[in-house]
From Swiss-Prot:
Its main location: cytoplasm. The 26S proteasome consists of a 20S proteasome core and two 19S regulatory subunits. The 20S proteasome core is a barrel-shaped complex made of 28 subunits that are arranged in four stacked rings. The two outer rings are each formed by seven alpha subunits, and the two inner rings are formed by seven beta subunits. The proteolytic activity is exerted by three beta-subunits PSMB5, PSMB6 and PSMB7. Forms a ternary complex with SMAD1 and OAZ1 before PSMB4 is incorporated into the 20S proteasome. Interacts with PRPF19. GO terms for biological process: negative regulation of inflammatory response to antigenic stimulus; proteasome-mediated ubiquitin-dependent protein catabolic process. Belongs to the peptidase T1B family. Keywords: Acetylation, Cytoplasm, Nucleus, Phosphoprotein, Proteasome. It is found in: Cytoplasm; Nucleus. The modification N-acetylmethionine is found at residue 1. Non-catalytic component of the 20S core proteasome complex involved in the proteolytic degradation of most intracellular proteins. This complex plays numerous essential roles within the cell by associating with different regulatory particles. Associated with two 19S regulatory particles, forms the 26S proteasome and thus participates in the ATP-dependent degradation of ubiquitinated proteins. This is Proteasome subunit beta type-4.
Amino acid sequence: MEAFWESRTGHWAGGPAPGQFYRVPSTPSCLMDPMSAPARPITRTQNPMVTGTSVLGVKFDCGVVIAADMLGSYGSLARFRNISRIMRVNDSTMLGASGDYADFQYLKQVLGQMVIDEELFGDGHSYSPRAIHSWLTRAMYSRRSKMNPLWNTKVIGGYAGGESFLGYVDMLGVAYEAPSLATGYGAYLAQPLLREVLEKQPVLSQTEARELVERCMRVLYYRDARSYNRFQVATVTEKGVEIEGPLSAQTNWDIAHMISGFE
């Protein structure tokens, strides 16, 4: 009677029926003994959810400028419109990241703890921009080799020892330095504009670098469907790191009705 009542109330849904034998399903051996489970790589980050698009970086005569918009895209949906993709690492280094935002948040936590651990020594030394860049190349390549990469492309800017530094690291650990950098769609749209100016004038002032980056952010807003007209600009000089924003560029859509063929 109790079994009948429990079956009617759903307590034994999928369990034994009254008056019949119940065959207990077998448990996979890998659940009983974890050591017998086949060794497979952990792949938690193979499907990025919330992503960010381009990050731009330019050297100038006494520092570096980095810019990134504040949009987090959920697929093609402009879901989060007020997230920061630029972080201050220490007084001489800053970092911008495109790609999976969750992986960027994880990296922020790791780098933040590294800086705290270094400051605890109290010896007056801190990580240089080049040291942070070098560590990131090893960290990204290590994760890639474990088939569980951090799905980001990073731009590291800094100023130390009277020298400006601008470096690039992608999710595979590929790294290089350059006077101008762009990730994501900006590598196709903004980088040619940056190089065009730097070829004519290799050394920019801070004002010129700032205006160039803002111009490129405006072009990306016009042309990149995953960009947004709300961005941050970070500058590092011998005085330290300064992050400004959110900012918006002045736009003009008067010729929009003349563009056809992209419907």
